[in-house]
Every structure is written in C-alpha cells, then in structure tokens.
C-alpha cells in the first residue's frame, strides 16, 4: 500500500496498516517526516459534546464529524500504546477534551512504527493509495498573498491527484484555519509558528490599513475567524490595537523581538499583523470509510479531506488521527 504524505495522517495510516499485516510505503516529498504536526502545539482534541461540534462547524459533514468525535478517545489511547507520552493528559479548554504531545517525540514514535518512510519521494500512480499530503495551504497562501504557517510542502498534490481521477470536492476551498502573525518585516521561522501567534482573547480592536474597524464582534475562542477576516482586508494585513499597559506582555515582546512593527500612541499599542494559513478546510470528498468519492481504490485522510470543519474550526490532528487509522482498515478489506 502506498501512502502519500508523512505527516500525522500518513504516518498513522502506515502504522495501523503494519499492525494489520500490510506492507505500507510512505512517500514524503519533503526532507523530513512529521508534516505540519511537527510545527504545531500538538494538541489533539474533540469537543466535549457532539452538539457543540455541530454548532461550531454547522456546514461540515455530520457523518464524518460524528465518526471523529466518537473514535478519537480510542485513537488517542492507541497512540499512547505505541509509546507516545502525553505532555498534557487533557486540554486546558473547558469546551474540549484530548491530549497534548511533544510533536517531535510523537513524530519519532510514528516514524519508527511506520517502517518504510521515504523522504523526497513524490506521488506515484500505484493503487490502492492513501492521500495524506496535507491539503493546499501553501498554494492558497501564495495565491492570496498571505503568510504560510505550516510545512512548505502542502501544495495540493493530493487534491490535484484525486481530481484528475474523477474525485469531487467537499467544503469551502476558500476556508482555512490560521492565525494572525507579525506582519513583514518580522522574521518568522517554523519554530515560531506557535510562539508568535497573536491571540488576544477579546482584548484588542481590529482596524485595516485604511483605518476602518473591520471585526466588531468578539472572535471565536480559536480566533481562526479573525485570521480569515484579516486575510480579506487590503494586503491581508491589519492592526491590532491594545492598551499600552501590554507593552511588556509576552505577545508584544515576541512580536517586537521578531522585527515586527509596534507603534505606541495615545495610550495604545498598534500591532501590525498579517493573516497566516495553517491548513485548508476544503478538499477531497470522502465517505465514513475514508474512500474517495468517485475513485475506486483511493483513500484520503488529514488535511487533504474537505468538509469536516466547514463554517468553524475543529482539530485537524484529530481528523488526521482517526481517518488515518480508518483508511488503513478500509484498504485491508
């Protein structure tokens, strides 16, 4: 079995396939395994109540949402059984439950268990095939003049491969999960993606480059809605305005030290930010068995799949974990 992509979904799929007696081969076009999981805070979570999941992501596929919600706890226990040690035994969010892992340690555990992981290898046409190439965040960001907040290889290879073979899409191809990050000339490395995120939990006002306030409600708890709103402003940038009392706040200090722009005037700080794309939320349409609609012998998992979090946000790593396991189990049938 060929698995395209060596991030969370692809590695999980390969590990589960080996457990079931298959001989998977993971083809990762990048220079390292781990995908965007390696760059994340690595919290793998679900909503406490399924109704909250539906309310948070009302446009998503209800069957896929329920599948992820119902199977995540067992999938997390399976990760731990492989030797992955949680950093947190639960989330710190009263709306959610899950576990946090060290992303490097988790990647190492999965790579060891996956077996045949080949780097700098691209998609091949052999089937059965599992697509787990990480969506098209990089392509989307470049097309729209936004920052990239993910691994540099999520360019839509899986989506293109599937569409060429008759697949259809699900979800909104213009919807993404992302963050507001320090705007250029700030210097942002992969190791800064979590640390430099500008999350202000209702303590900021938001104006665009024309000085117009563009987001006059409280952001959602995850603030991805705010990042998407910033992306729609001229230049994909904005100014977050907070009290000058925050001048030594870690978020302000980090932005300033990264070379970002902080302007203090009239008792306020103006922080220059830009929208950054972590992963796309539209993508390949699949069913509950992770089969790609319209293409025999083709499966998909992770950010290549669309239509799970439409209209809101849910854990991309949770979807990758659950669907990666299911893809392996379905391929065995």
Where are these regions (language model features)?
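N-terminal Rossmann-like FAD-binding beta1-loop-alpha1 element of flavoenzymes
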Residues: 1-26, 328, 332
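Short hydrophobic core segments
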Residues: 2-4, 27, 126-135, 299, ...
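Short, small/polar residue-rich loop motifs at catalytic or cofactor-binding pockets
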Residues: 7, 199-201, 278-280, 313-314
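Conserved N-terminal/central alpha/beta ligand/cofactor-binding core
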Residues: 29-115, 203-220, 239, 245-247
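A conserved short coil-to-beta-strand element within the FAD-binding core of flavoproteins
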Residues: 116-126
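Glycine-rich loop(s) and the adjacent beta-strand/alpha-helix scaffold that form part
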Residues: 131-185, 317, 323-326, 330
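An anion/pyrophosphate-binding glycine-rich loop and adjacent beta-alpha core
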Residues: 161, 165-264
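A glycine-rich dinucleotide-binding beta-alpha-beta segment and adjacent secondary-structure elements
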Residues: 261-311
